[in-house]
From Swiss-Prot:
Biased composition (Polar residues): 337-373
Disruption phenotype: Leads to defects in actin polarization, endocytosis, bud morphogenesis, as well as altered abundance and distribution of the cortical actin patches and increased sensitivity to calcofluor white and Congo red. Also shows attenuated virulence.
Protein name: Regulator of cytoskeleton and endocytosis RVS167
Keywords: Cytoplasm, Cytoskeleton, Endocytosis, SH3 domain, Virulence
Length: 440
């Protein structure tokens, strides 16, 4: 916008606000308002015709191109992967030669169909799209003329308001008289300009309306029959699709189910698919389970102590423990059994109190019914259900349980879903782990 246009816009701004809020005197022409309404309808119809014809032209071309690309993708899926493209025997179909042949035949049919529809699509572009674009250019020029007419109306109302302000004064000075005469001259000029553009549009718009009835309506009719011809061609060519691989006589869902077979069961039997399903659970649910496992007390309560005492792995408590020397400790290290210890160590750390010598203890031996030393207790002896790890698992987040393949894990809490997150204990550590990594 030039500086002159910006200046005019500032001068017209107050009158524009008054016109929007219907304040003061506003110049109106009922004949022009009706013509303006019809002109807007023509403008909208022409834009719609241009946009819809473009969309249809691009949609048909895009649909055919996508069908060709789809057939190419299916053929690539059926073809085996080969690292030597120069070897002719490397590209021999090994999996589904019928599927490759069907995809190539379908690709050829679609290419032929695209060549058949090419003249019809070009006819749409020449007979519909291009004429609609030319009509839009004419409408845009008329719209500029209508905007100029609206600006002249604002100027006329603005000058009339200025003139009425001086005329309403009861006592006018000489300076007011000069301004009033100047305002009268401006009103006359603005009235002439407004009448020129207003009469021009009122005389020319009916001609456009007559041309519209002779131009736009036939375009819609032509567009309809062109679409009908394209749909008929698509229907007839697809109905004549003679590819033995496709059974077009049966229901499409039944044919798909028959060709699919038991592929879902075979896929579920692969271990890697269960791995993906297990880790595809909601992160929020996994986080809740980790926090629940971290906040729950460890399973080393009275039940585990009782089971340890009854199992016989550790010696019983001796009443004279405070007076016994260091060598009389009843603790058995789980790393090595008593049968492989030296005589000195066996006499001091592993042997019962009955066999302690007076020299070593400094007091008479006490008879305590203790079980002889045995092998170290197994990792799992708390009475909880256990499971065996099928794979190695490394903790992915805080609260996870790490274990190697073959490890025996105590199950503290489990879900009904084998792919869920279970809570267990291994090697003194408590945490959560995926249930599909273990076997009961």
């Amino acid at each position: 916008m030039s500086f002159k246009g910006f200046k005019k816009g500032v001068l017209r701004a107050p009158q524009t606000m008054r016109q929007k809020f219907n304040m003061g005197e506003i110049t109106q022409d009922a004949v022009y308002l009706d013509a303006e309404r019809r002109f807007k309808e023509i403008e909208m119809e022409t834009k719609k015709l241009s946009e819809e014809s473009k969309k249809y032209f691009n949609a048909v071309n895009g649909m055919l191109d996508e069908q060709i690309d789809f057939a190419k993708a299916v053929a690539e899926i059926y073809k085996p992967i080969s690292g030597r493209l120069s070897d002719p025997s490397a590209t021999v179909p090994e999996d589904n030669p019928q599927g490759i042949e069907a995809s190539e035949s379908y690709q050829a049919v679609v290419k032929d169909l695209k060549d058949t529809l090419k003249p019809d699509l070009e006819l749409i572009e020449k007979r519909i799209v291009e004429p609609a674009q030319e009509l839009l250019k004419i409408i845009q020029a008329i719209r500029k003329m209508s905007v100029k007419r609206d600006h002249k109306q604002l100027d006329l109302d603005r000058h009339k308001r200025n003139l009425s302000k001086y005329e309403s004064k009861k006592e006018r000075t000489v300076k007011d008289e000069e301004k009033m005469f100047s305002a009268q001259a401006e009103v006359e000029i603005a009235q002439q300009e407004y009448d020129y553009y207003n009469d021009l549009l009122k005389n020319e718009l009916p001609v456009l309306f007559q041309m519209q009835s002779d131009f736009i309506k036939p375009l819609f009719v032509s567009f309809y029959y062109m679409q009908l011809n394209i749909f008929y061609t698509l229907y007839t060519r697809m109905e004549e699709l003679k590819i033995p691989y496709f059974d077009l006589s049966t229901d499409i869902v039944e044919a798909y189910t028959a060709k699919k077979g038991n592929i879902e069961e075979q896929t579920d039997a692969i271990g890697i698919t269960h791995f993906k399903v297990g880790h595809a659970k909601s992160k929020l649910e996994a986080t809740k389970r980790r926090h629940a496992a971290m906040n729950s007390p460890p399973p080393t309560g009275a039940s585990s102590i009782a089971s340890t005492g009854t199992g016989g792995e550790l010696p019983a408590y001796s009443p004279g423990g405070y007076n016994q020397p260091y060598g009389d400790s009843k603790y058995q290290p789980p790393s090595s059994p008593a049968t492989y210890q030296s005589p000195v160590v066996a006499a001091t750390a592993q042997s019962p109190a009955t066999y302690q010598s007076p020299v070593a203890t400094g007091q008479p031996p006490s008879y305590l019914p203790q079980t002889p030393a045995s092998a170290p207790p197994p990792q799992v002896g708390s009475g909880l259900p256990t499971c065996t790890a099928l794979y190695d698992y490394t903790a992915q987040a805080q609260g996870d349980l790490t274990f190697p393949a073959g490890a025996v894990i105590e199950i503290i809490q489990r879900t009904e879903d084998a792919n869920g997150w279970w809570t267990g204990k291994y090697n003194g550590q408590t945490g959560v782990f995926p249930g599909n990594y273990v076997q009961l």
